[in-house]
Design a protein with these regions (language model features):
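Extended serine/threonine-enriched, polar tracts that run as long, contiguous segments within proteins
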Residues: 178, 210, 216-269
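Short, solvent-exposed loop/turn elements at domain surfaces
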Residues: 58-62, 184, 228
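Long, contiguous amphipathic alpha-helices that act as assembly "spine/axial" helices in icosahedral shell
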Residues: 51, 79-141, 166-179, 218, ...
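Extended, compositionally biased alpha-helical segments that mediate assembly or anchoring
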Residues: 2-7, 252-358
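N-terminal "assembly arms/tails" that initiate or stabilize quaternary assembly
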Residues: 1-86, 326-358
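Short alpha-helical segments and helix-capping/turn motifs at coil-helix boundaries
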Residues: 31-38, 160-161, 263-265
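Short, Lys/Arg-rich flexible segments
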Residues: 1-36, 93, 98-107, 121-140, ...
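Extended, solvent-exposed, turn-rich assembly/linker loops in the middle of proteins
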Residues: 136-217
Length: 358
């Protein structure tokens, strides 16, 4: 009787699929952004593509039974172009000697690939956090310095009011909070427990999803400043993500897409000169904030389209003094007209903040 070993070769596609799912499970903030892939960018100049955004027009009123002395007013229709580009190549590269591969580790799938996937995921997460922190905000709201739960809830209500007045989408609204906000809200009865389904179970996003408050899904991030929070709609930022193809010179490799659309490439080869096996995991990425012209009603009751573009899809909140932190439309050539036309010049009636401790 002949003894034989049945070796089962694991396909690169299967390893890459495992790695991309591991990477996707580590993401929190990037999953809150609108995603676009590589097909929109192929052939684009300077790695940039202009995404067409429909224009907006004001509505006017032609007086009933007027003497027809004045003609209709014609407004110019202008479509906008949002320039988005890939600006990053997040990667993790490592190598194993023959001795390490045979004696020290259990293989690429159990040790190395998971570590590489988590490293790339952290890079994507940090990029999304930076996009949040460096973005432009037409509305910033202070929630006081005392850590009072009612002040925090008031700030969230004020953020909701601002988004509503700016005409932001009510679909997929999320409140991304730092650890100090998390501590305050955990002790508040206003936080409704989240019902996490199978699609997000056992992931960093599921762990970060606390529940709902005032119409927002509340997601905690340890990577943003503890005293900051961001009220977002699902299209506040664009997350560009794609995996490059596999070069013919690679010994093994695959490009994969997770169930949630996160792309990643894994390459493996062997260097005979140094007798080491090399593994590289990478993904292309970029982030872009979305700004819009604002349509508002002027003093004559006429709809007007703003000259400048503003952030009307997200609001920044901070555990800081209300009087000095809360700002409505602090920048822009027609900021005063826009703020007045939207009714967003100050904290709305009905919201009263408790004074900060002395």
């Amino acid at each position: 009787m002949t003894n034989s070993l049945n070796h089962v070769k694991v396909k690169p596609e299967k390893l890459a699929a495992t790695a991309v799912e591991l990477m996707e499970r580590e993401l929190v903030v990037p999953k809150l952004f609108a995603r676009k892939g590589i097909e929109d960018f192929k052939g684009a100049r300077d790695d940039t593509v202009n995404v067409r955004v429909p224009g907006i027009l004001p509505a006017r009123d032609y007086e009933w039974r007027n003497n027809r002395a004045q003609p209709l007013s014609f407004d110019e229709y202008r479509e906008r172009k949002l320039a988005v580009r890939f600006g990053g190549n997040a990667y993790s590269a490592t190598m194993l000697t023959d001795e390490q591969r045979e004696m020290d580790f259990l293989g690429w799938t159990q040790d190395i690939l998971p570590a590489q996937s988590r490293a790339v995921a952290r890079k994507l997460e940090y990029g999304a956090i930076k996009a949040l922190q460096t973005g432009k905000y037409s509305v910033t709201i202070g929630a006081g310095t005392g850590g009072d739960a009612q002040n925090v809830l008031n700030a969230i209500i004020e953020a909701r009011h601002a988004l509503n007045r700016m005409g932001a989408s009510k679909v997929k609204r999320t409140l991304v909070i730092g650890s100090d906000w998390d501590t305050i809200l955990q002790g508040s009865k206003a936080l409704q427990a989240a019902a996490v389904g199978d699609s997000v179970a056992e992931s960093a996003f599921a762990d970060a999803l606390l529940g709902k408050v005032k119409g927002f899904d509340v997601v905690v991030s340890e990577d943003i400043a503890p005293d900051e929070a961001y009220a977002l709609t699902g299209d506040s930022f664009v997350f560009l993500n794609a995996a490059p193809g596999i070069p013919e010179s690679a010994v093994a490799g695959a490009s994969m897409l997770s169930q949630d659309g996160i792309a990643m490439r894994w390459l493996r080869d062997y260097d005979p000169q140094y007798q080491v096996e090399r593994s590289t995991v990478n993904t292309w990425y970029g982030y872009q904030q979305v700004l819009d012209p604002v349509i508002y009603v002027d003093d004559q009751g006429q709809e007007v389209v703003s000259d400048e573009e503003y952030n009307i899809r997200s609001v920044k909140l901070k555990l800081d003094k209300v009087a000095t932190t809360t700002k409505y439309f602090p920048e822009g050539s027609d900021k005063a007209k826009v703020a007045k036309g939207l009714g967003l010049t100050k904290t709305p009636p009905g919201i009263t903040y408790l004074p900060d401790p002395a």
